[in-house]
From Swiss-Prot:
Family to which the UniProt record says this protein belongs: Belongs to the DTD family.
This protein's UniProt keywords: Cytoplasm, Hydrolase, RNA-binding, tRNA-binding
Assembly mode: Homodimer.
Gene name of this polypeptide: dtd
Catalytic activity: glycyl-tRNA(Ala) + H2O = tRNA(Ala) + glycine + H(+); a D-aminoacyl-tRNA + H2O = a tRNA + a D-alpha-amino acid + H(+)
Disulphide linkage map: none
Domain notes: A Gly-cisPro motif from one monomer fits into the active site of the other monomer to allow specific chiral rejection of L-amino acids.
InterPro entries tied to this protein: Daa-tRNA_deacyls_DTD, DTD-like_sf
CDD domains: Dtyr_deacylase (cd00563)
EC number: 3.1.1.96
Pfam families per UniProt: Tyr_Deacylase
Protein name listed in UniProt: D-aminoacyl-tRNA deacylase
Length: 147
């Protein structure tokens, strides 16, 4: 899995002008699923995300997790994280998981996250508009195959 984590003051995702999910303080996750991803990748990503200390404590140090601040997650599927830009000027997305597998793993990932923190989400495969107010900004890339 490839994920982009953005610390936000608020974020929302809309489809056809209607809000599908919205959060206040927390994390916006852009979630890409690869063809070789499995339950181990999901568990690793969930563990890292819910425990990563990227929120400020009383002294202004990044020392608190999303659980510590009682934040929420907005999860948005994003197959374009697997873009291959090596040849030409048009990205290829053949490195992303096929839709059936990606949807299954994305849904399972969100269910596992929801065991720890509230999770809002976009609609898998939909054309979405994402709005956010970055906090920091703090943006972190997490690749489950690089640990």
């Amino acid at each position: 899995m490839k994920l982009v984590l953005q610390r936000v003051k608020e974020a929302s995702v809309s489809i056809d002008g209607k809000i599908a999910g919205a959060i206040n303080q927390g994390l916006l996750l852009l979630v890409g699923v690869g063809p070789d991803d499995n339950a181990e990748d999901l568990a690793y990503a969930v563990r890292k995300i819910v425990n990563m200390r990227i929120f400020s404590d009383a002294d202004g140090k990044m020392n608190q997790s999303i659980q510590d601040i009682k934040g929420s997650i907005l999860s948005v599927s994003q197959f374009t994280l697997y873009a291959d830009t090596k040849k030409g000027n048009r990205p290829a997305f053949t490195g992303a998981a096929k839709p059936d597998l990606a949807r299954q793993l994305y849904d399972s990932f969100n269910e596992q996250l929801a065991e720890f923190v509230p999770v809002e989400r976009g609609v898998f495969g939909a054309d979405m508009q994402v709005s956010l107010i970055n906090d920091g900004p703090v943006t972190i890339i997490l690749d489950t195959k690089c640990h």
